[in-house]
Amino acid sequence: DSFASWHRALPLFDALGIKATFYVNTLPFDAAFGTERDRYFDRLAHKGERQALSAEMLRDIHSDGHTIGCHSHSHFSLASLPRAQWDSEIRRSKDILEDLTGAPIVHFSFPYGMRRFFSSALRDYCRDIGFETIATGIPGMQTADTGDRFAIHRTGWLLDRPIDHNLDDLRIDGRLFERVTGRSAIG
């Protein structure tokens, strides 16, 4: 989601020898900023610091060996957009990130990530424009034999929570939760 706080976490990742994937929205890097940027943060219902990641911070994250992935341009629910707008949200974001990092961007994560926010047509589109993996927001353990690299589980990591809380979140199998309760594991 492109928050500056990601950059402040780099020393912790370095100290622990951890490499992470950061899925980035690109609206904060676009020349159009202004009120569109304010609406972006309001839409995310962000309650804390509203400082966006700068281009320099993004390059630092990338040069530290972390993976940069695409998360759309302005974090809209892509499933609610007509097909004609997918390029402006997805391909535009991919192009901006490739320009900023100087590297191919081959990983994508659907904004919001729950099943109602993406479709097989969106998944196919992302694959067709060159993404090698697609992350959902469906929590659960991801293992090499899980299978579909175009439906990877993604579990958030909350820096203000104890590590045990975050590890418990990683153990949740979102698919089992949905099957048992009939509800989404994340909202």
Each PLM stretch: what is its role?
Residues 3-4, 80-107, 112-187:
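C-terminal active-site subregion of NodB/CE4 polysaccharide deacetylases
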Residues 11, 59, 123-124:
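Alpha-helical segments flanking ligand/cofactor-binding loops in enzyme cores
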Residues 3-4, 14-116, 151-152:
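Metal-dependent polysaccharide deacetylase catalytic core of the NodB/CE4 family, i.e.
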Residues 1, 6-9:
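Conserved beta-strand->loop/alpha-helix structural units within folded catalytic cores of enzymes
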